[in-house]
Amino acid sequence: MFYALGPLALFAFATEVMATPVAYPMTTASPTLAKRDSCTFSGSDGAASASRSQTDCATITLSDITVPSGTTLDLSDLEDDTTVIFEGTTSWEYEEWDGPLLQIKGNGITIKGADGAKLNPDGSRWWDGEGSNGGVTKPKFFYAHDLTDSTIQNLYIENTPVQAVSINGCDGLTITDMTIDNSAGDDAGGHNTDGFDIGESSNVVITGAKVYNQDDCVAVNSGTSITFSGGTCSGGHGLSIGSVGGRDDNTVDTVTFKDSTVSNSVNGIRIKAKSGETGEIKGVTYSGISLESISDYGILIEQNYDGGDLDGEVTSGIPITDLTIENISGSGAVDSDGYNIVIVCGDDACSNWTWSDVEVTGGEDYGSCENVPSVASCST
């Protein structure tokens, strides 16, 4: 039998239906992939795989990696406190390009070379005697950029095309027992094979480094609180500040070179301030440096660098202050046609120096020193 519902009954029925909750299917959160403790990559696909997986692994081991031509072994997106270990030989295929061949960034990163491991880009394939000044385009090797509170231990780098290690934007980086061996470039056209180029960084400590190359062993272009100690430099241009000037950051403050040897090199100690530029070189110390077989300049301090040593007008825009040079041993170290000590300063631009126990002989006295602070001397 059919019964008709009145208006009040219909209203009550509709209200009850609307008040009844609709049962939807239950949803669950997507599972979170756990970060693996250790990942190992090898072979020709290893570089790309490591780059893709760098946020997933607490420890990344690169074992006998071959990096394809024209690409960077890119570990610039590492999670905090990641460890990177190089095993065996890491090699790179050939291409003419700017690089870098290797790039590592991050916070709390530990980079290690296992016993017997080598990073060998086989730079001889690019060497033509012109370095970064011409010839074929050569890739820079290792960008250690934007590393904070990080360490690099026991890396062995062999035969870079040009500059080896660029340190930039780092704060709290410690490098121990690194070897950069470009000695093969002495007779095969290696050029501009700088060991460590440092800029815009602070609290950098390099200990026990061995650098065999054809340019600066260390060049500090800007930065604060930088120390290089217990090092061996051979074949290059010595322990350098600069050139300073003409960059975004033109301040060098509190840099120490100590207990190191420079041999078979063009220069021993060199400070280069660019002619006509502005900046500041302050609180630099060279202490306990031993010089051997220096061809051109035992100690060179210049405020007229203009692309070449002593080439420009002497200017005062980059003062050199609070400089300490002490306990320098170089008796007979300079070639007979080289210069023992050269100091060329602008007016009132070199002040508050400390100069003690400096013995650099074998070469000539430079007859055109300018504005030498009273504590120092160009004569030996």
Swiss-Prot record:
GO terms for biological process: cell wall organization; pectin catabolic process. Its main location: secreted. Optimum pH is 4.8. It is found in: Secreted. Optimum temperature is 48 degrees Celsius. Belongs to the glycosyl hydrolase 28 family. This is Endopolygalacturonase AN8327. It comes from Emericella nidulans (strain FGSC A4 / ATCC 38163 / CBS 112.46 / NRRL 194 / M139) (Aspergillus nidulans).
